[in-house]
């Protein structure tokens, strides 16, 4: 007996970014099977969910972490971060959260989420910060109490990335 699983866009996106991060790290032994399975999942989604998924994929970038980056303080991501990011990104709503910087100082942020950057093993929220009038990269394991803000929407901005960072759509399969 075969059953059909109902997956949300966030669940499919989580699968895709997991595969992408493993591919970027260079250790995905069954990449072909993973891609085939994900393609089947995408085909089973309703057209509005495929549109949401593609918009999500357009914001996903991967690269390699510089060897000198200290990851000794890396922690777990807040479980409510991805759902809050999904809603904020798809609906172009501000994302509000507490952010702990490298020195341990916690600040409240209200940003416009533009992209997600995976530099395995670290993940970053790339956002326009209206208070600073510039892009900011937030390590996702340092974000707590995330919530999208109902109301005013924002416009997408072109996010400049350095060489060595690629859109997930441009990664070799």
Task: Describe these PLM feature segments.
Residues 114-115:
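Short, surface-exposed charged micro-motifs
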Residues 111:
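Acidic, two-metal ion nucleic-acid-processing modules in DNA metabolism proteins
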Residues 76-82, 96-98, 107-108, 125-173:
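Surface-exposed, charged, gly/pro-rich loop-and-adjacent secondary-structure segments at domain edges
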Residues 88-99:
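A short, Trp-centered hydrophobic/proline-enriched beta-strand micro-motif
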Residues 1-13, 172-173:
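Short, basic/aromatic recognition patches that contact phosphate-bearing ligands
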Residues 9-81:
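Bulky hydrophobic/aromatic content
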């Amino acid at each position: 007996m075969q059953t059909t699983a109902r997956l949300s866009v966030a669940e499919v996106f989580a699968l895709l970014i997991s595969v992408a991060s493993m591919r970027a790290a260079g250790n995905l032994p069954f990449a072909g099977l993973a891609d085939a399975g994900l393609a089947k999942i995408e085909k089973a989604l309703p057209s509005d969910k495929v549109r949401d998924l593609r918009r999500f994929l357009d914001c996903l970038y991967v690269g390699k972490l510089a060897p000198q980056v200290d990851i000794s303080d890396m922690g777990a991501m807040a479980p409510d971060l991805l759902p809050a990011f999904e809603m904020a990104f798809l609906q172009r709503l501000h994302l509000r959260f507490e952010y702990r910087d490298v020195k341990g100082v916690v600040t409240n942020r209200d940003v416009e989420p533009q992209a997600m950057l995976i530099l395995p093993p670290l993940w970053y929220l790339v956002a326009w910060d209206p208070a600073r009038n510039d892009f900011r990269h937030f390590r996702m394991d340092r974000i707590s109490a995330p919530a999208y803000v109902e109301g005013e929407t924002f416009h997408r901005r072109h996010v400049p990335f350095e060489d060595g960072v690629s859109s997930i759509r441009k990664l070799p399969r």
